[in-house]
A protein has these predicted regions:
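Metallo-beta-lactamase
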Residues: 74-75, 81-83, 141-210, 255-267, ...
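Accessory terminal helices/loops
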Residues: 18-34, 148-152, 161-170, 174, ...
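C-terminal motif of bacterial Sec signal peptides marking the signal peptidase cleavage site
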Residues: 12-14
Length: 568
């Protein structure tokens, strides 16, 4: 990977996991989670619906993939998390029906639903239509662009991507994430819509509806003749992820409820979720919709009630529990989202990060607070003794908090690291919520000295052709290190062979991006979009691109390399 790359898919992972000592105790708390893995037994199930055959692939990656048979072609709903999984799934789909794929429908932007699409373009001459909500590509570009480093790292922890295989039970809504097993296969949609779209493809009547919920671009698919509904990620057999610990924009809980009510109004006889198994039967599906939406409304309404009573989010999260008649539903076991995290997210969504406590508006810095806690404990040595005592007593959450103070004091020695690792393993091992379990165990594994940075996701030109050049310029903006620039106005202009122009002006500590032609450029760069993408993603060394003439710099090749080096 070249040092000039600004878009890389990096996480902490191990080059030799098998050489690491990592023992996780078996606890009774995870028995339900182990049983939950039965939900993801790998298979393709065929359903003879009133409108025709629907094939349902489950257990290959996190998300399910669905194939609907048409008259002279088939439709894929959600394309799996990788070309690797898409190939395995389609080998089985093709045995059911070998007609070409006429269309791929993305229910939303998440990679486990979109990153396998390119496989279908690779295997047939006919290019399938890619259908999605009009905002789907925006969210894909955002995640793989400016937020890529932190979302990639936190997602890898949450999904247990680099845990030893024997320690990954499941990820709550699927068996595992396989995104690293092949180059990213995202393909931009070429047919989008805002609120609803009714279309007939290969004789199949399809109705698509915008249904904000787990994502803002979420849609659901209604096949009226099949009496079948595909809800995407708005319902699955676990408590909904009203907030995800990998990080996300605020999820509109009231919009999610409204979307569930809309789906319920169709009275489907077949429900094919994008995670967990299908549900058959109008009455059962109707009851599940009621239970699910009522649980979400309960959490929302009670959070608002207690917010208005003056409680803080951490207090509210301890006060609210689902009524027993709701919490006993298998669709509301906390195998993905939790009530506690949801409460805090709802509070933040309405009131923002400040909880209302004046002591927490401008608190002491982490380091200053750690110094004072250390002083209260009797000094740094006494603080370490308290950490040892907490671990001995298996008071592990307190141990984690104590180790935070020691880290802030730059006292993260081998003993503190070992004690923190024990606390993380203990807390993770006893959690029946896979998001928490995987995040804690992954964080513990990262503390091994053998860990180093490596790529999670492979990329190639197919991916780059679907990556907007503006995504890369936006990444440059947020990777600019002003301390590495002298502060003077400096303008670099890019002229692409397609006729597209972009410029970056460095001024006042920011990198200002423009899509208009500029005068008085310090550097002018002439190239193709794909070539700059290769350089900025590390597929090519800019020195070789300049030497070959694929990048021409007016104003100095060395100056251009220096310019690239200030984006980190």
């Amino acid at each position: 990977m070249y040092k000039y790359a600004i878009l890389t898919f990096l996480i902490l992972t191990s080059c030799s996991k098998e050489n690491l000592e990592f023992k996780v105790p078996t606890t009774s708390e995870v028995e339900k989670l182990i049983k939950h893995s039965d939900e993801f037994n790998q298979e393709v199930i065929t359903f003879d619906t009133p409108g025709g055959k629907i094939h349902f692939a489950i257990g290959f990656g996190i998300a399910n993939s669905i194939m609907v048979e048409g008259q002279d072609g088939n439709i894929i709903i959600d394309a799996a998390d990788s070309r690797y999984d898409a190939e395995k799934i389609y080998e089985l789909f093709r045995k059911k029906n070998s007609n070409p794929v006429k269309a791929i429908i993305y229910t939303h932007n998440h990679g486990d639903h979109t990153f396998g699409a390119a496989y279908y373009l690779d295997i047939q001459d006919y290019k399938p239509q890619i259908i999605a909500h009009e905002d789907t590509d925006y969210y894909v570009q955002r995640i793989i662009g400016i937020l890529n480093p932190i979302i990639t790292q936190r997602s890898a922890r949450m999904f247990g991507t680099f845990l030893p295989e024997e320690e990954l039970i499941n990820v709550g809504i699927g068996p595992r994430l396989n995104v690293s097993k092949s180059p990213n296969g995202y393909v931009k949609p070429d047919l989008t819509f805002s609120d609803e779209l009714k279309i007939t493809i290969s004789g199949i009547e399809i109705e698509l509806y915008h249904a904000p919920g787990e994502t803002n671009d979420q849609i659901f698919v209604w096949l009226p003749k099949h009496k079948s509904l595909m809800p995407g990620d708005n319902i699955y057999k676990t408590f909904p992820n009203l907030y995800t610990i990998r990080g996300t924009t605020h999820r509109d809980v009231t919009g999610w409820i409204e979307s569930l009510d809309l789906m319920k109004s169709f009275y489907p006889e077949y429900l094919f979720p994008s995670h967990t198994r299908p549900v058959i039967g109008k009455n059962e599906i109707n009851n599940i919709f009621i239970t699910y939406r009522d649980a979400i409304q309960y959490i929302h309404d009670q959070t608002i009630r207690l917010m208005n009573a003056g409680y803080y989010p951490d207090e509210i999260s301890e006060m609210i529990e689902l009524p027993q008649n709701l919490s006993s539903s298998p669709f509301l076991y906390e195998f993905y989202g939790t009530v506690r995290w949801s409460v805090k997210s709802i509070f933040n969504g309405y009131l923002g990060w400040f909880n209302g406590n004046p002591a927490e508006l401008d608190p002491l810095s982490r380091k200053e607070k750690a110094k004072r806690i250390s002083k209260l404990a009797g000094g740094e040595n006494e603080l370490i003794k308290e950490l040892r005592l907490a671990v001995d007593k298996e008071d592990m959450q307190w141990a984690l908090e104590l180790s935070d103070y020691l880290i802030s004091l730059d006292l993260f020695n081998s003993e503190v690291k070992t004690l923190r690792q024990k606390a993380l393993i203990h807390e993770g091992a006893k959690s029946s919520n896979p998001n928490k379990r995987n995040y804690f165990l992954s964080s513990a594994l990262e503390l091994n000295d053998e860990f180093e940075l490596t790529n999670l996701m492979n990329i190639d030109d197919t991916f780059l052709n679907n990556l907007s050049i503006d995504t890369l310029f936006n990444v440059l903006s947020v990777r600019f290190k002003p301390e590495d620039h002298d502060g003077s106005l400096y303008k670099v202009c890019f002229n692409f062979s397609s006729g597209l122009v972009r410029s970056i002006s460095l001024r006042n500590g920011v990198a200002v991006i423009s899509n208009e032609a500029q005068n008085n450029c310090d550097l002018e760069v002439l190239t193709q979009e794909i070539e700059l993408k290769r350089v900025l993603t590390g597929l090519k060394n800019p020195v070789s691109s300049i030497s070959s003439g694929e990048i021409v710099v007016q104003g100095g090749n060395t100056e251009f390399l220096k310019f690239l080096a200030i984006f980190r």
